[in-house]
From Swiss-Prot:
Species: Homo sapiens
Gene3D superfamilies: Penicillin V Acylase, Chain A (3.60.60.10)
GO molecular function: cysteine-type exopeptidase activity; dipeptidase activity
Residue ranges of the propeptide: 1-5
UniProt name for this protein: Secernin-3
Length: 424
């Protein structure tokens, strides 16, 4: 399988405005995979010895898990990207290198994303959670639903209100880079070179034993663990370089809207089209002022250029995200038994979005009407969120239903577009 999949970005002061950290990710997956946006509340687990069912394996549960909002392929337990109630955001990428990928079922990188969010209240603690689980349970297993086998190692971009971490893995070996200012992005290649803040204790010795490092030159993680001919990975390296250029183009003035425009960029390949396409997108505002709420925007639909970024804010008693939640099927039946039957996982928003796109694809006038209405809704939402951040006022009663109501407003645009008459 060719290395097509995802781009994740972070921008920190002084690259951003208003002392905010901005996180963004495009999830690039198979064209027919549905991604849902779901919320799970915080839970105290009183049952000592409780076991947790992840996508393929069971692991030990912890005494307490935090509230999380996730954007995830609807067939699995983990997530491609998400955030928790403490302002921690994580996105993962598929990476390949010299260390052989294991098809044996273990924790998926997407499981590790969710576990990091559920168990950590800072970015570095999330890194600790992930590397500890990686050591204990390993990573591996098919990352797609159905007959096709698609396995990979993972890199992660983890951010909170104060800093970001890049964590890149090769089997059980890993390196981590701390990011405290400026911009950083990851794609489908190892990108940590000599700036290593933390690492697996045997990472260098293993590379030396394998003949990947002579023990004399300054250790370069990407050079040691990447394929000999990384030039063959032109697609991922191209997107990585293009993403870096786009971030630096706006350096000093990056806002959440800037990040959305980067995710919508098609010439760079960041907004991907084809067999693998951008199935969902996420952008988060993480104010360094802890009195301000973190705001997380999700699309829940393919192609951010033709989707609406809808805001989510953590408050008590969040309304269920029914319109972006897929029908439930037993993982035991469909994943554990390796069923080749792919059920219809389309949630209400996805269904209306796809129906509307089918209508407008061959009708430029309808397409313009729909897109104009989508951007109008988005701009209204952006103004409301900016007002919350500037005025430091949060109407909790309204916020509990914020994301569900935005989703209903988006669905109404698609329904109206399906019935609107245009001039001949």
């Amino acid at each position: 399988m060719e290395p097509f999949s995802c781009d994740t970005f972070v921008a920190l002061p002084p690259a951003t405005v208003d002392n905010r950290i901005i996180f963004g990710k495009n999830s690039d997956r198979l064209y027919d995979e549905v991604q849902e946006v779901v919320y799970f509340p915080a839970v105290v687990h009183d049952n000592l010895g409780e076991r947790l069912k992840c996508t393929y394996i069971e692991i030990d549960q912890v005494p307490e898990t935090y509230a999380v909002v996730l954007s995830r392929p609807a067939w699995l337990w983990g997530a491609e990207m998400g955030a928790n109630e403490h302002g921690v955001c994580i996105g993962n990428e598929a990476v390949w290198g010299r260390e052989e990928v294991c098809d044996e079922e273990a924790l998926l990188g997407m499981d590790l994303v969710r576990l990091g969010l559920e168990r950590a209240d800072t970015a570095e603690k999330a890194l600790n959670v992930i590397v500890d689980l990686l050591e204990k349970y390993g990573q591996g297993g098919n990352c797609t639903e159905g007959r096709m086998v698609f396995s990979y190692h993972n890199s992660f971009l983890i951010a909170d209100r104060n800093e970001a971490w890049i964590l890149e893995t090769a089997g059980k070996y890993w390196a981590a880079e701390k990011v405290q200012e400026g911009v950083r992005n990851i794609s489908n290649q190892l990108s940590i070179t000599t700036k290593i803040a933390r690492e697996h204790p045997d990472m260098r010795n293993y590379a030396k034993r394998k003949g990947w490092w002579d023990g004399k030159k300054e250790f370069d993680f990407a050079a040691a663990y990447s394929y000999l001919d990384t030039a063959k990975m032109m697609t991922s390296s191209g997107r990585y370089c293009e993403g870096y250029k786009l971030l630096n183009k706006h350096k000093g003035n990056i806002t959440f809207e800037t990040m959305m425009e980067i995710l919508r960029d098609k010439p760079s390949g960041i907004n991907m089209e084809g067999e693998f396409l951008t199935t969902a997108s996420m952008v988060s505002i993480l104010p360094q002022d802890s009195s301000l709420p973190c705001i997380h925007f999700f699309t829940g639909t393919p192609d951010p250029e033709r989707s609406v970024f809808k805001p989510f804010i953590f408050v008590p008693h969040i309304s269920q995200l029914l319109d972006t939640s897929s029908p439930t099927f037993e993982l035991e039946d469909l994943v554990k038994k390796k069923s080749h039957f792919k059920p219809d996982r389309r949630h209400p928003l996805y269904q209306k979005h796809q129906q509307a796109l089918e209508v407008v694809n061959n009708n430029e006038e309808k397409a313009k009407i729909m897109l104009d209405n989508m951007r109008k809704l988005e701009k209204e939402l952006f103004r409301e969120m900016e007002s919350i951040l500037q005025n430091k006022h949060l109407d909790v009663e309204k916020i509990v239903n914020l994301f569900p109501q935005c989703t209903k407003d988006e669905i109404q645009i698609y329904q109206s577009n399906l019935s609107v008459k245009v001039s001949s």
